[in-house]
């Protein structure tokens, strides 16, 4: 049967049923109990993310399709993050496009209107042509769906590493807006509701949930990848929002198809589904395939019988298939019938409560012997600043219609966080952050670090983080070293979100990101954080003669840094000091509201040098004195490329105000230099470094490699 179930799981369900499941039931169990759908190796840890917050309307403990938080004035935002990693490795265009479609349907399943998308893409070395092909088609897929459906892509991440040569990661986050009293659940609480299915069911995406719950074998069928139809997706979006008041619950048909959607929507009650009533794209489909098909652009609604006609009429106006396929029952049994014959009859609770697993762990935290860095400064600057992770992503953003719906306030690339306007007049900032290199060194510090970095990035536009979702991407959890990094990353994320009092209201776990030889990717947890602008919004601008102020203390912590990655520098990973991140962020927000700064950049990937380079690409020069840097090392390379947390580079005409404000908060700040008109020149301790070639690389790299690839 090609099942992914473990022998212990098969024995467990036999005992619970006191019988042998039939072949179709095995396929249903395989889908519902898949790691992709059940979180059987992770759910016990995810509960630690739950934070009681008065703003949370729908959180992680509710375990619904998306999280929701109150933003005031009767409004709520809905937020979700998802991935389509395995499908994108096989068919990058449709894999990425259907990832966008799926997350949009998760947002509208709450009755919310999607207002923003973010994409976080990680691929392998671009010297390998396959990776160029993957990236180009991933971007094309995201653009094709997002542009067609009318939801702007407002930001994201793009990074490169050999670890993703066979396993690209394609993450998509979405934000929606809804009146808080109009939020729809994905589950029901009473029997008698009719199950209404919108959309055609085909043979694409068969076994997709199971496919996503194992490593890539090199022999996977492209049939496991769903086919995107953005125009149908637009119809689903518009009509779902139109009929939301007429339905009791809404659920996207994602992983596991109807098998999972019906089971989860029943929420401990039961359901009867008549397979012959399901509209098909392909004639004479096998009933078992109909149950687990993951054809896109389908939604399941639980509807009072009196409203069924009105709901389906809305779809009929667009000639979009809509059919009553069953109903919710009081008997806690999930039944799929075919012309009156039960093909599947399984207890709801048995399906919803798979065996949970705690796998062995092996401590892989590295103890590194510190050595003095002895690298030539000039070539080190040129090499690090030329790295693809640091180049402009403008070519990528240009593929997206990021201004559709006119809610985008800060266009992608113009700041460290995306900013969109809300119906209540407030501004919402959004940022995604991950750091797989740091996670490879110390997953616990990495977990703290990505939360802190997202928080700092929001501060640079004047926002304070208020809600987050996480995406945890790892290899095979049964491997002790993989499971250890997973558990440690969760520990770090949980500690940081509790410190900042930022509830995680949802997320995703993606295991089995391995190549055909069983080599896992670097641990890649991701945080997407959103927060309201607290007063004034900062749109970065560079002015001649502005003072360069370094906010925060620099430490010789190069482990997991871009410098360490390129030059194999042995060093300890940074210790994330959350109090410093919080206080330095407060200084930045205060300075923005007092209009004391014109530019703010958190120091992260590439260290201080990369942040200074971010000023230079605006058409200016920068001169600094490394002797002014407050640090525990006098090594110039270490000071320039350390990625210690809690730091910012800011531009101001009132540097003493910044220093005094920082001192009042208990944070160090130092005036390290000035901006000048020496275009593309970085002056360090009175020595000029001409970065003109690096600046050209910054603006043209992606178009030259991908656009012409």
Curated annotation (Swiss-Prot):
One of its GO terms (cellular component) is cytoplasm. Pathway: Purine metabolism; IMP biosynthesis via de novo pathway; 5-amino-1-(5-phospho-D-ribosyl)imidazole from N(2)-formyl-N(1)-(5-phospho-D-ribosyl)glycinamide: step 1/2. It holds the Pfam family FGAR-AT_linker. It comes from the Archaea. It catalyses: N(2)-formyl-N(1)-(5-phospho-beta-D-ribosyl)glycinamide + L-glutamine + ATP + H2O = 2-formamido-N(1)-(5-O-phospho-beta-D-ribosyl)acetamidine + L-glutamate + ADP + phosphate + H(+). The active site is at 36, 84 (proton acceptor). Mg(2+) 2 binds at residues 106, 252. Mg(2+) 1 binds at residue 82. GO terms for molecular function: ATP binding; magnesium ion binding; phosphoribosylformylglycinamidine synthase activity. Monomer. Part of the FGAM synthase complex composed of 1 PurL, 1 PurQ and 2 PurS subunits. NCBIfam families: FGAM_synth_II (TIGR01736), PRK01213.1 (NF002290). This is Phosphoribosylformylglycinamidine synthase subunit PurL. It comes from Saccharolobus islandicus (strain M.16.4 / Kamchatka #3) (Sulfolobus islandicus). The gene is purL.
């Amino acid at each position: 049967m090609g099942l992914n179930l473990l022998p212990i799981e098969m024995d467990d369900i036999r005992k619970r049923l006191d019988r042998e499941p039939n072949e179709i039931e095995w396929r249903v169990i395989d889908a519902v109990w898949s790691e992709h759908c059940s979180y059987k190796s992770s759910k016990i840890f995810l509960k630690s993310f739950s934070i009681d917050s008065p703003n949370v309307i729908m959180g992680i403990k509710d375990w619904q399709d998306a999280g929701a938080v109150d933003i005031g004035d009767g409004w709520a935002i809905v937020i979700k993050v998802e991935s389509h990693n395995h499908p994108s490795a096989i068919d990058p265009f449709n894999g990425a496009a259907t990832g966008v479609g799926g997350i949009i349907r998760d947002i509208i399943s709450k009755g919310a209107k999607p207002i923003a998308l973010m994409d976080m893409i990680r691929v392998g070395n671009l010297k390998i042509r396959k990776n160029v092909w993957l990236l180009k088609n991933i971007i094309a897929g995201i653009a094709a769906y997002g542009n067609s459906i009318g939801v702007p892509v407002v930001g994201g991440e793009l990074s490169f590493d050999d670890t993703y040569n066979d396993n690209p990661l394609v993450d998509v986050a979405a934000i929606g807006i809804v009146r808080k009293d109009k939020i729809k659940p994905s589950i029901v609480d009473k029997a008698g509701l009719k199950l209404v299915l919108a959309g055609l069911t085909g043979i694409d995406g068969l076994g997709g949930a199971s496919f996503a719950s194992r490593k890539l074998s090199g022999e996977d069928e492209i049939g496991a990848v769903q086919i995107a139809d953005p125009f149908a997706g637009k119809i689903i979006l518009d009509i779902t929002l139109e009929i939301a008041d007429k339905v009791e619950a809404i659920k996207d048909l994602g992983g596991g198809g109807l098998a999972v959607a019906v089971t989860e929507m029943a929420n401990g009650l039961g359901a009867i589904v008549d397979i012959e009533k399901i509209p098909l794209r392909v004639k004479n489909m096998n009933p078992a395939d109909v149950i687990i098909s993951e054809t896109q652009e389908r939604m399941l609604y639980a509807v009072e019988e009196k409203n069924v006609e009105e709901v389906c009429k809305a779809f009929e106006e667009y000639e979009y298939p809509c059919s009553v396929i069953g109903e919710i029952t009081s008997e806690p049994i999930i039944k799929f019938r075919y012309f009156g014959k039960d093909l599947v009859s399984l207890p709801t609770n048995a399906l919803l409560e798979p065996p949970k697993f705690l796998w062995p762990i092996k401590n892989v935290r590295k103890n590194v012997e510190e050595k003095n860095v002895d690298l030539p400064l000039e070539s080190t600057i040129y090499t690090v600043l030329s790295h693809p992770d640091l180049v402009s992503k403008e070519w990528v953003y240009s593929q997206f219609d990021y201004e559709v719906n006119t809610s985008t306030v800060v266009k992608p690339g113009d700041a460290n966080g995306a900013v969109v306007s809300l119906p209540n007049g407030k501004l919402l900032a959004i940022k995604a952050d991950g750091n797989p290199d740091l996670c490879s060194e110390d997953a616990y510090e990495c977990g703290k670090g990505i939360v802190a970095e997202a928080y700092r990035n929001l501060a640079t536009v004047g926002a304070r983080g208020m809600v987050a979702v996480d995406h945890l991407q790892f290899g095979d959890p049964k491997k002790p070293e993989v499971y250890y990094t997973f558990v440690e990353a969760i520990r770090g994320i949980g500690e940081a979100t509790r410190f900042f009092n930022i509830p995680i209201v949802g997320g995703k776990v993606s295991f089995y990101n391995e190549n055909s030889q069983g080599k896992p990717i670097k641990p890649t947890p991701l945080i997407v954080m959103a927060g309201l602008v607290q007063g004034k919004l900062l749109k970065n601008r560079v002015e001649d003669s502005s003072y360069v102020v370094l906010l925060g203390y620099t430490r010789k912590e190069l482990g997991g840094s871009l410098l360490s990655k390129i030059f194999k520098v042995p060093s300890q990973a940074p210790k994330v000091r959350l109090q410093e991140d919080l206080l330095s962020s407060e200084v930045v927000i205060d300075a923005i509201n007092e209009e004391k700064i014109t530019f703010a950049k958190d120091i992260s990937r590439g260290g201080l040098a990369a942040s200074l380079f971010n000023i230079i690409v605006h058409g200016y020069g920068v001169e600094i004195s490394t002797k002014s840097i407050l640090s525990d090392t006098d090594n110039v390379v270490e000071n320039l490329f350390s990625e210690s947390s809690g730091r910012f580079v800011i531009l101001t005409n009132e540097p003493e105000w910044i220093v005094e404000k920082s001192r009042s908060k208990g944070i160090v700040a130092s005036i390290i230099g000035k901006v000048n008109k020496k275009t593309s020149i970085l002056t360090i301790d009175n020595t000029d470094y001409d970065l003109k070639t690096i600046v050209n690389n910054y603006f043209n790299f992606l178009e030259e490699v991908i656009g012409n690839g």
